[in-house]
């Protein structure tokens, strides 16, 4: 919702992904222009940018999908000098398929407690120019994060971190 509020009246492309957040294609959000498969949102936004550089491109991906297939898209977007904002919806679980652990949860598939892999550090290591984490329920902070992210000349990322509602 913060992205839609911040970008009101501007030319945008919203690239979706497979996950609970695919429901963002329905009203009242109505903000999924594309939805193909896990991880395709980031690479599709990159393609949009290179074909329509006056359009600000956003990709929406969950934390679990980011670890499964989003990292490669981020690396390619940085390498190919795309201007886009990667929105990671981090609820610290794999909610859509049964709350399985992933590298960001700090729990292995065998239930062993290990150090979490930091999404922020992964994005920074890949060369993302701006990485911020916000609470999506703090609308003022979230809208400002979007406004700041679109000013970045290159790949920016916003991690919207909140618990799963399921």
Across the structure, where does each feature detected by a protein language model lie?
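Cys/His-rich short segments
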Residues: 163-166
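Cofactor-pocket helix-loop regions in the catalytic cores of large enzyme subunits
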Residues: 1-26, 68
């Amino acid at each position: 919702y913060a992205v839609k509020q911040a970008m009101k009246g501007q030319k945008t492309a919203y690239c979706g992904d497979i996950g609970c957040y695919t429901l963002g294609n329905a009203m009242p959000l109505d903000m999924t222009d594309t939805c193909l498969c896990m991880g395709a949102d980031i690479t599709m936004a990159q393609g949009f940018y290179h074909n329509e550089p006056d359009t600000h491109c956003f990709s929406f991906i969950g934390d679990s999908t980011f670890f499964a297939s989003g990292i490669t898209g981020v690396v390619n977007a940085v390498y190919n000098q795309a201007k886009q904002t990667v929105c990671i919806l981090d609820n610290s679980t794999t909610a859509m398929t049964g709350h399985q652990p992933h590298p960001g949860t700090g729990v292995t598939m065998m239930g062993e407690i290990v150090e979490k892999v930091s999404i922020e550090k992964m994005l920074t290591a890949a060369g993302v120019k701006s990485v911020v984490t916000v609470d999506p329920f703090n609308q003022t902070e979230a809208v400002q994060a979007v406004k700041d992210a679109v000013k970045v000349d290159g790949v920016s990322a916003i991690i919207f971190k909140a618990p799963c509602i399921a």
